[in-house]
Amino acid sequence: MQNRPIIIGVTGGSGGGKTSVSRAILSNFPNEKIAMIEHDSYYKDQSHLTFEERIKTNYDHPFAFDTDLMIEQIKELLAGRPVDIPTYDYTEHTRSSKTYRQEPKDVFIVEGILVLEDQRLRDLMDIKIFVDTDDDVRIIRRIKRDMEERGRSLDSVIEQYLGVVKPMYHQFIEPTKRYADVIIPEGASNKVAIDLITTKIEKILKEARN
């Protein structure tokens, strides 16, 4: 492994294709030591709250995340030390008791709606990417995901989107576009953008190994 891992930040609105872009980049490096760290894993523990209180949490606000812990763990990985990353239980709306061990890698993709919002996190990144997707596409994807994967009802997803997700996108997420080195329209289907980013990562890796 090289002396310092490459950190790539990937952000954009909920349902905008961040994960697809991240996986597309990952798939271009099958023989490299590369891994993805999701900001969603760092949603704060809410076990002290009732279930009714938990479901009212604004999950699209910076305060919902334990970004301090994420920064601390990324710094540990940068120093070549493994960390135990938390996991989040979306059905119980709180942090799970389970963690997973993340070993040091050459490249880390840090993915989430607010990973460019905190300057301390941005300062750790070598490449910052904003996935720019139409609002209509994002809401359709979010409905499909939350109903199929998180057991949500259609009404609850739409209510949350209109009352929280959409306003938080315009208040906190969209403004971080100005920090991005690369803005990708059309998400993972934009093969040119994915290839350009892949080439840049390959160049950084090559330079680090020489």
Swiss-Prot record:
Cellular compartment(s): Cytoplasm
Q: Name one GO biological process term.
A: CTP salvage
Q: Which domain of life is it from?
A: Bacteria
List the CDD domains. Answer: UMPK (cd02023)
Residues annotated to bind ATP = 12-19
Q: Does the keyword Cytoplasm apply?
A: yes
Q: Which GO terms describe its molecular function?
A: ATP binding; cytidine kinase activity; uridine kinase activity
Record pathway: Pyrimidine metabolism; CTP biosynthesis via salvage pathway; CTP from cytidine: step 1/3; Pyrimidine metabolism; UMP biosynthesis via salvage pathway; UMP from uridine: step 1/1
Q: Taking the first listed entry, what is the main subcellular location of this protein, grouped into a coarse class?
A: cytoplasm
Name the keywords, alphabetized: ATP-binding, Cytoplasm, Kinase, Nucleotide-binding, Transferase
Give a single Pfam family match. Answer: PRK
A single GO cellular-component term on record: cytoplasm
InterPro entries the record matches: P-loop_NTPase, PRK/URK, Uridine_kinase, Uridine_kinase-like
In the Enzyme Commission scheme, what number(s) does this protein have? 2.7.1.48
Q: Which reaction does it catalyse?
A: uridine + ATP = UMP + ADP + H(+); cytidine + ATP = CMP + ADP + H(+)
Q: Which NCBIfam families match?
A: PRK05480.1, udk
Which family is annotated?
Answer: Belongs to the uridine kinase family.
| Protein name in the entry | Uridine kinase
Native source organism of the sequence = Streptococcus gordonii (strain Challis / ATCC 35105 / BCRC 15272 / CH1 / DL1 / V288)
Q: What is the organism lineage in this UniProt record?
A: Bacteria, Bacillati, Bacillota, Bacilli, Lactobacillales
